[in-house]
Each structure stands twice: as structure tokens, then as C-alpha cells.
Amino acid sequence: MAGVSSESLSAALASLETKLAHASLELSAELFGTVDVLDGNAGLRRALTDPARGASDKAGLVAQLLHGKVSAEAESTVASLATSRWSSARDIGDALETVAATVAIAVAERQGGSAGLERLEEDLFAFIRVVGSSHDLQRALDDSKATAEAKGALALKLVPNASDASALLIRQAVASPRGLKPVALLERFVELVAKRQDRWIAQVSVTRDLTAEQTARLQAGLNNLYGRDLKINVEIDPALVGGIRIKVGDEVVDATVATRVAELRRQLAS
């Protein structure tokens, strides 16, 4: 996904972030179910991504499709995606799949913090390893004659201790891999988990080692700012000249001398 579709997905994920504190696995399942509906109706995908249609028209189509069948939160999430811009009709389904998986991952995070994300990742990797080492299992999960329910039941037998979030993502991958092998789709989900884990790590760049007191103050300040216990990784970079650069997830705080000098040079050159 690239261009305008990538921008629309980024905006959707940013908007979703404000709602994840109350999100549920039920919401994730509803969104995954809507992905299946979109995949089965090319005309609907084209209608929802047609740039000639107005936002209210698209929202109306979503209401006709989903109202009373899913939660209001699921309906509004799909409507928001429908009123965004997409490079191709398929991209809206891909984006909704990413949003649905992100909801499930965030639920695991809310329930267990960083440890919850680690367990989710371990569950998914365990399934990937088991299936990847067995041609018989791969054939069984690829069998077009087998029902989604049968594939899901088989998959969960392979990871009997999987968390609820893990089970949801695994079932989705085997029941609706959307043109991929189930393992390949789960690997994409693992990438989303890893990106979520980055929110628990502060990458700190400084010109020299921090003292124990400085590290403790930095730890306390970052934990207070982000509302969670972050792991701090310190990198020594003499090129920064002075100051500090902190990266947590996609957020970067750059208070280095090198950056300030570069900005001054840009201003003088303009």
C-alpha cells in the first residue's frame, strides 16, 4: 500500500489510537467480518472507494450494509475508512484488516502490558513454527473444501494455550488469508505486534554515558509522560555534539546540538 492509501491508513490508525482504551476483541472480530464482506463484493468495494461519490453517500452505504448488524463503533470505523481516499478498491479491505488486527493487539497490550504483547508474539510464532515444519498441516489449512470453522478448530489445537487475542488472529489467518498463506498473514500480524512493542521502548541517543542518577530521572520522566514503564536503550553518538534525542514508537523528541545547528543553517540558507 502506497501513496494516498498509505496516508489514509496512517490517519485511520492515528484516529483509532484515541479509542483503543475501550476497544474489545468483539470489535476486532466485527471488523474482520466486514473485511470478509468487502472481499466478497467487488461492486461494494468500488462504490466505497469511488472518488466521485461524496462522503455522506459512502457513509450511507456503510449504514445500509452494517447498521444493526455490528456495533456502532464498528460501523463508525468502517464509515471513516470509506470516506477516506484510496488508490485502489482493494486497499480499503487491506486497511480494515490492519485496523482489526491492531484492535486485537491493543487489547492484549491493555490486558498484559508489554508482557501481553510478548505472549501474543510468542503464540503467533509458535503457530508459524509448527505449521511451517509440517507439509500435512499446510495442506490441511490450504484445503479449499474444508470449512473455516474446521480450519480454525485445527489451528487452535496446535496452540492450545493461546490467549484470546492470539486465538482470534490465528483463526482469522486460517479462515480468511485473503490470497496469502495463513503463515504469511500471521507474519504480517507479528510485524504489527512488533511495532506496538516499540511503544514500550525508549531509544535514547546522547554524546556520553548517562550517570545512574540521570538515567533514573530520565526513566521516571518518560514513564510519567507516557503512562507506562518503558525500557530505555541508550546509544552513544558523539556526532550529536550535545543534548539528547529520544524515540518512542513513532514519536521523536530531538534536542541535540547537531539538529539545532542544522536547522539554523536551513534558516540562513532560505
Q: Which residues are covered by each model-predicted region?
A:
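Elongated, mostly alpha-helical coiled-coil "stalk/stator" tethers of large membrane protein machines
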Residues: 1-245, 251, 255-270
